[in-house]
Amino acid sequence: MLDILILAAGKGTRMRSDLPKVLHPIGGKPLVQHVVDTARQVGGEQLLLIVGHGAEQVEQRMAAPDVKFVVQAQQLGTGHAVQQALPHLRPEATVLILYGDVPLTRAATLQKLVAGVTDQQMALLTVDLPDPSGYGRIVRDTSGAVVAIVEHKDASDEQRLICEINTGIMAVKARHLQQWLPRLGNNNAQGEYYLTDIIAMAKADGVAIHVEQPGAIQEVEGINNRQQQATLERYYQQQQARALMDAGVTLLDPARFDCRGNLSAGRDVVIDINCVIEGEVVLGDGVVIEPNCIIINSKIGNNTHIKAFSHIEDAVIAADCDIGPYARLRPGTNLADAVKIGNFVETKKAVIAKGSKVNHLSYIGDARVGSGVNVGAGTITCNYDGVNKFKTEIGDNAFIGSNSALVAPVNIGAGATVGAGSVITRDVDAAELAVARGKQRNIQGWERPTRKS
């Protein structure tokens, strides 16, 4: 039986931000979301989020059926925070205590920690640091048993030489917390109720202290300022890149790749430099992505080529497509096999069938385009009258001449041709030619104006 507490009430003054610290992102999602996701992997039956500063924002962002919020109205220390959760803890449960600003602890590490808890033993996660300044020190007796945790500001000169520090993450029986937390005092340099003071109480009550350590220091690093956030972001991205390369993805420079979501990739995928993946992205076999592309919540089919500087969001792209460079595919774009979307083309809510081409300088929005269609350079679907959006339908094998404006709602039939420079306001039937432009006049003898000297 496992209850998991996540402390997320702090202000984060050193972030110098109006956003609560735990909502600042790593890898495209809030710090506390990483912790909640890991808690779910560990498998607690009850998940309690202790909120305080910016509670409404945190609750709004983190609301979920399995998350219960507990308010810490005054932030009087970690012990005080856990005290607020006491009425919600199940007496027979093991309690795992985590921190909303420590995002990268692995579930496997926490599962080992929880496994170390018995009726007469609690568990601490500690780590050895080359420079432990500012952290609470793990004090051991001559037998090596943990006897206390001393905060840096309260530590003696001898204790400050200790390199093993408290990460704050611990697991303990709920009934022990119910005995110990009401006895906490705030007679310390900070005037706060330290959760770490329960270690001395455990020792006095004959409860042993089991210690686990993480596989990497970064698992237990917290974020208090922007520099720490940036440092941990780089570590997170390195881990993401390694996992992708282990799965067979070619990253031409792993240090210049960002995954801010979840990427699923097929075989022989190649991603060039400065590409950003956000949200849920699926890449088929043989996909090539050139430099400086952004792909958000999209699915890209086998052997599709995304050329440089393209921006793709909430789109579905089938196999053997050719996109960009400098293409923008907006939400609702759905491309069938072998579609070509060229440079400076924008699509939105556009369904384009197999083999069609929109190669240059065009806008296709609220449109359904058939197969084998050629859309000439500079063509736009005029889909908005200032209030409402209207749809354009283009049939199979139609040809739209360059610099045409298709004023929706309008239907271009299969095999129809629209002459270059036309403004089409009425339907064009199948196989018809539509030309809608002013008649050309050539004026003989005309002289260009000249400047007066």
UniProtKB/Swiss-Prot annotation:
<keyword id="KW-0479">Metal-binding</keyword>
<feature type="region of interest" description="Linker">
    <location>
        <begin position="227"/>
        <end position="247"/>
    </location>
</feature>
<comment type="pathway">
    <text>Nucleotide-sugar biosynthesis; UDP-N-acetyl-alpha-D-glucosamine biosynthesis; N-acetyl-alpha-D-glucosamine 1-phosphate from alpha-D-glucosamine 6-phosphate (route II): step 2/2.</text>
</comment>
<feature type="binding site">
    <location>
        <position position="330"/>
    </location>
    <ligand>
        <name>UDP-N-acetyl-alpha-D-glucosamine</name>
    </ligand>
</feature>
<dbReference type="InterPro" id="IPR029044">
    <property type="entry name" value="Nucleotide-diphossugar_trans"/>
</dbReference>
<feature type="binding site">
    <location>
        <position position="166"/>
    </location>
    <ligand>
        <name>UDP-N-acetyl-alpha-D-glucosamine</name>
    </ligand>
</feature>
<feature type="binding site">
    <location>
        <position position="72"/>
    </location>
    <ligand>
        <name>UDP-N-acetyl-alpha-D-glucosamine</name>
    </ligand>
</feature>
<dbReference type="InterPro" id="IPR025877">
    <property type="entry name" value="MobA-like_NTP_Trfase"/>
</dbReference>
<feature type="active site" description="Proton acceptor">
    <location>
        <position position="360"/>
    </location>
</feature>
<dbReference type="GO" id="GO:0008360">
    <property type="term" value="P:regulation of cell shape"/>
</dbReference>
<dbReference type="GO" id="GO:0000902">
    <property type="term" value="P:cell morphogenesis"/>
</dbReference>
<dbReference type="Pfam" id="PF14602">
    <property type="entry name" value="Hexapep_2"/>
</dbReference>
<comment type="subunit">
    <text>Homotrimer.</text>
</comment>
<feature type="binding site">
    <location>
        <position position="151"/>
    </location>
    <ligand>
        <name>UDP-N-acetyl-alpha-D-glucosamine</name>
    </ligand>
</feature>
<dbReference type="GO" id="GO:0005737">
    <property type="term" value="C:cytoplasm"/>
</dbReference>
<feature type="binding site">
    <location>
        <position position="136"/>
    </location>
    <ligand>
        <name>UDP-N-acetyl-alpha-D-glucosamine</name>
    </ligand>
</feature>
<keyword id="KW-0511">Multifunctional enzyme</keyword>
<feature type="binding site">
    <location>
        <begin position="99"/>
        <end position="101"/>
    </location>
    <ligand>
        <name>UDP-N-acetyl-alpha-D-glucosamine</name>
    </ligand>
</feature>
<dbReference type="InterPro" id="IPR038009">
    <property type="entry name" value="GlmU_C_LbH"/>
</dbReference>
<dbReference type="GO" id="GO:0019134">
    <property type="term" value="F:glucosamine-1-phosphate N-acetyltransferase activity"/>
</dbReference>
<dbReference type="InterPro" id="IPR011004">
    <property type="entry name" value="Trimer_LpxA-like_sf"/>
</dbReference>
<keyword id="KW-0460">Magnesium</keyword>
<keyword id="KW-0961">Cell wall biogenesis/degradation</keyword>
<dbReference type="InterPro" id="IPR050065">
    <property type="entry name" value="GlmU-like"/>
</dbReference>
<keyword id="KW-0808">Transferase</keyword>
<feature type="binding site">
    <location>
        <position position="21"/>
    </location>
    <ligand>
        <name>UDP-N-acetyl-alpha-D-glucosamine</name>
    </ligand>
</feature>
<feature type="binding site">
    <location>
        <position position="224"/>
    </location>
    <ligand>
        <name>UDP-N-acetyl-alpha-D-glucosamine</name>
    </ligand>
</feature>
<dbReference type="GO" id="GO:0006048">
    <property type="term" value="P:UDP-N-acetylglucosamine biosynthetic process"/>
</dbReference>
<feature type="binding site">
    <location>
        <begin position="383"/>
        <end position="384"/>
    </location>
    <ligand>
        <name>acetyl-CoA</name>
    </ligand>
</feature>
<keyword id="KW-0548">Nucleotidyltransferase</keyword>
<dbReference type="GO" id="GO:0009245">
    <property type="term" value="P:lipid A biosynthetic process"/>
</dbReference>
<dbReference type="InterPro" id="IPR001451">
    <property type="entry name" value="Hexapep"/>
</dbReference>
<feature type="binding site">
    <location>
        <begin position="7"/>
        <end position="10"/>
    </location>
    <ligand>
        <name>UDP-N-acetyl-alpha-D-glucosamine</name>
    </ligand>
</feature>
<dbReference type="InterPro" id="IPR005882">
    <property type="entry name" value="Bifunctional_GlmU"/>
</dbReference>
<dbReference type="Pfam" id="PF12804">
    <property type="entry name" value="NTP_transf_3"/>
</dbReference>
<dbReference type="InterPro" id="IPR018357">
    <property type="entry name" value="Hexapep_transf_CS"/>
</dbReference>
<feature type="binding site">
    <location>
        <position position="363"/>
    </location>
    <ligand>
        <name>UDP-N-acetyl-alpha-D-glucosamine</name>
    </ligand>
</feature>
<comment type="function">
    <text>Catalyzes the last two sequential reactions in the de novo biosynthetic pathway for UDP-N-acetylglucosamine (UDP-GlcNAc). The C-terminal domain catalyzes the transfer of acetyl group from acetyl coenzyme A to glucosamine-1-phosphate (GlcN-1-P) to produce N-acetylglucosamine-1-phosphate (GlcNAc-1-P), which is converted into UDP-GlcNAc by the transfer of uridine 5-monophosphate (from uridine 5-triphosphate), a reaction catalyzed by the N-terminal domain.</text>
</comment>
<feature type="binding site">
    <location>
        <position position="377"/>
    </location>
    <ligand>
        <name>acetyl-CoA</name>
    </ligand>
</feature>
<feature type="binding site">
    <location>
        <position position="101"/>
    </location>
    <ligand>
        <name>Mg(2+)</name>
    </ligand>
</feature>
<feature type="region of interest" description="N-acetyltransferase">
    <location>
        <begin position="248"/>
        <end position="453"/>
    </location>
</feature>
<feature type="binding site">
    <location>
        <position position="437"/>
    </location>
    <ligand>
        <name>acetyl-CoA</name>
    </ligand>
</feature>
